[in-house]
Amino acid sequence: MNKLYEEYDNRIAFLIVYILEAHPTDVWQMQSNIKDKVLFATPKNEEERAFVAGACVRKLGIKLPAVIDEFGNSSEQAYTGWPDRIYLIDTNRRVLYKSKPGPFGFKPEELRTRLDRIVKTASRANLRQ
């Protein structure tokens, strides 16, 4: 995602919404979390969630802007975001692309194809004005 963000940042708005911790140490620990040193128990309040989100962004080297879902998980529920999803949403709030659950369901080339289409359409529209 960092690569796509760097490539399209001046034309597409990117945002990560940190939702429920996918693999907390007290529920379902994954080897990838151990390797990446992303080892956190389930946050018990918004402050803990903010701390974990910030640590994950730093430890994983995420360059995209990030926000945190509220503790009631409204974004996660609205977009079925757990454990990870990639969405492409237009300015009218229509979902143009929804990945399969990640990280195994992520297909960056599918997303790149959609992004290219949007950029081309926007460029043609700007030329007509």
Walk through the language-model features, giving the residues of each:
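Gly/Pro-rich cap/lid or specificity-loop segments adjacent to the active site
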Residues: P43-K44, L64, F71-G72
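Structural microenvironment flanking redox-active thiols in thiol-disulfide oxidoreductases
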Residues: M1-L60
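Loop/turn elements at helix/coil->beta-strand transitions in domains of secreted/extracellular proteins
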Residues: D9-A13, G61-P65, P83-D84, T91
